Amino acid sequence: MQTPPVKDGPRINDEIRVPRVLLIDQHGEKQGEMPTASAMEAAEEAGLDLVEIVPNANPPVCKILDYGKFKFQEQKKKNEARKRQKVVELKEIKLRPNIDSHDYDVKAKAMHRFFEEGDKVKVTLRFRGREMAHPELGMKLLQKVKADFDEVAKVEYEPRMEGRQMIMILAPR
């Protein structure tokens, strides 16, 4: 024996089993509290559906409307909300301790663009060969980055050595 499928969404027409409801007509006007049967008749006369909008109110609030259209509008709202949602990405900018000023400016411009888009930026400073003997140069460069982006970004992960590279993560304010 199978159980009936669980219906999601509001109850409509015959699925509304409460004795009395608070009715709102198709024009959005409050009709007051009435027996469910009367509300069903009013919906039938209008050629529309009786939809339970607020089921946990006392009495439940029902509205006369076209259920197909209502479902479509709800789906549209959900899709719009999903579209507006921004996924924060982690972008990476790779630097070297002895970076030239113009190269630094180009990287800084890219970082500004990432912050405007609302993304986090991971600044990776890679050391090669003898550069490992001077981690203070790398720290100085990352402090410069931190100071340059103080107004638009906050430090989420302080500069730290990880193997042959120094890493810092900045997030937009």
Swiss-Prot record:
Alphabetically ordered keywords of this record: Cytoplasm, Initiation factor, Protein biosynthesis
Intracellular or extracellular location(s): Cytoplasm
GO biological process, alphabetically ordered: ribosome disassembly
Gene Ontology molecular functions: ribosome binding; translation initiation factor activity
Domain of life (superkingdom): Bacteria
UniProt main location, coarse: cytoplasm
InterPro entries cross-referenced by the UniProt entry: T_IF-3_C_sf (IPR036788), T_IF-3_N_sf (IPR036787), Translation_initiation_fac3_CS (IPR019813), Translation_initiation_fac_3 (IPR001288), Translation_initiation_fac_3_C (IPR019815), Translation_initiation_fac_3_N (IPR019814)
GO CC terms, sorted: cytosol; membrane
Subunit and interaction comment: Monomer.
Free-text function comment from the UniProt entry: IF-3 binds to the 30S ribosomal subunit and shifts the equilibrium between 70S ribosomes and their 50S and 30S subunits in favor of the free subunits, thus enhancing the availability of 30S subunits on which protein synthesis initiation begins.
Family in the record: Belongs to the IF-3 family.
UniProt-recorded name of the protein: Translation initiation factor IF-3
